[in-house]
From Swiss-Prot:
(2R,3E)-phycocyanobilin binds at residue 84. Keywords: Antenna complex, Bile pigment, Chromophore, Cyanelle, Electron transport, Membrane, Photosynthesis, Phycobilisome, Plastid, Thylakoid, Transport. Its main location: plastid. It comes from the Eukaryota. Contains one covalently linked phycocyanobilin chromophore. It is a peripheral membrane protein. Belongs to the phycobiliprotein family. GO terms for cellular component: cyanelle thylakoid membrane; phycobilisome. One of its GO terms (biological process) is photosynthesis. This is C-phycocyanin alpha subunit. The gene is cpcA. NCBIfam families: phycocy_alpha (TIGR01338). Heterodimer of an alpha and a beta subunit, which further assembles into trimers and the trimers into hexamers. The basic functional unit of phycobiliproteins is a ring-shaped hexamer formed from two back-to-back trimers contacting via the alpha chain subunits. The trimers are composed of alpha/beta subunit heterodimers arranged around a three-fold axis of symmetry. The phycoerythrins also contain a gamma subunit which is located in the center of the hexamer. Light-harvesting photosynthetic bile pigment-protein from the phycobiliprotein complex (phycobilisome, PBS). Phycocyanin is the major phycobiliprotein in the PBS rod.
Amino acid sequence: MKTPITEAIATADNQGRFLSNSELHASFGRFQRAASALEAARSLTSNSQKLIDGAAAAVYQKFPYTTQTFGPQYASTAEGKAKCTRDIGYYLRIVTYALVAGGTGPLDEYLVAGLEEMNRAFDLSPSWYVEALKYIKANHGLSGQAATEANGYFDYVINALS
């Protein structure tokens, strides 16, 4: 899994050299931000069900046809609603993995890769998940550096879906 630190190490190793001062400084900066990222991951995890349920409600509010149209990809049944919250939970979980890893590696490997094909295969609208992620970003309750860390990953996924 790629993170800024592992990429710097790989580059230095491929060039047969030690890490430069700027690479060491960047790595140290990452460690300083790690506490905030872990705080964000911990908070998102402990509030996950509330955030997921709120995000699903925001999707149903903005796209009411999702609860009125029948089909496996819609939330017109209890099973459909369970799938919707499961999928939103998956997005949120992968964001917490990225926070812990300190880079977009988990997002790239487990979420972004193949996202377009998956949505097309299951006839899922990316706009549903964009709305869900925007809701979570606006309502996660984080502040300061923890919010900055989390919001960067939410923006990354939202941009990938847009």
